Amino acid sequence: MLTNDQLAQWDRETFLHPSTHLAQHARGEAQGRIMVTGEGCHVTDRDGNRLLDAFAGLYCVNIGYGRQEVAEAIATQARELAYYHAYVGHGTEASITLAKMVLDRAPEHMAKVYFGLGGSDANETNVKLVWYVNNVLGRPEKKKIVSRMRGYHGSGLISGSLTGLPLFHAKFDLPLDRILHTEAPYFYRRPDTGMDEAAFVAHCAAELEALIDREGADTIAAFIAEPMLGTGGIVPPPAGYWEAITPILEKHDILLIADEVVTGFGRLGSMWGSDHYGLKPDIMTIAKGLTSAYAPLSGTIVSEKVWQALEKGTDENGVMGHGWTYSAHPIGAAAGVANLKLLDELGLVANARETGA
């Protein structure tokens, strides 16, 4: 049996960890932890420490650890059909069922869902679809994406550029061109402590308007935002923020991408953060709570308006050349189906609303 010391040595010698001080970890200076089991809201490491996982992994294990129903669904799918791709119209019962379940829970104006693996790749997909749509609609100059400082949207080339945290840009030559950032609705960090919430909301709206005027509305394709800031502070927007922002987007024909990776599937006491704040997004990013992290899966939900442009594009140009090998992976989809069933059966969305958790 492997000892803790042997595993720790292998870890230092072989494993390049995400978001880690790599040199300190390799030298054994940064404390690591080797996890073994999880049950409910607790996890246990190899040293026998039982820990309250108040962060739910990376705010993703919405149904808690150790749900056997999801484990059995994964095992059954792996035994029956461990993999098949989703290219050129192929599907599985799990992927088709999950698509239906997601759209049944999505806002009424949403039309289709595309499945990937994680929130980062979903936001890469979102931006590609926005660019594709504007090319189809004869607006090749309308390609810039406005994100927000302190926002988090992943760590890929596009998604890392969308992220508004310097750590994810440093030494990576990010953000890329076409990605712009505006004020975050973080009241505590307001530029003038004399501002009340109403004044700060007006400031955020004015900053967005000024950016649009400076760049040209005809060059800006979309605005991406988490309904409530996640990694940037887990901070709700001040009262009236979204009511001030959405009319600006509508006036300038700028699509709204709601990044629901964290806020989706009940985290705010409603199925979507967009529901909580009364938003009507054109595209929604989903991941984390889609499977409660029992298997990797993400999604891009597109509105009827976006879908019509995608449909037009393929009628005019043929197959749309976008996809991942593991798009709609059947094991991930099976986990998603079982997870959403549990979310309903256990009343977890209502419980979050009632307890304020």
Give, region by region, the residue ranges found by the protein language model.
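Conserved N-terminal phosphate-binding loop of PLP-dependent enzymes in the Aspartate aminotransferase
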Residues: 1-357
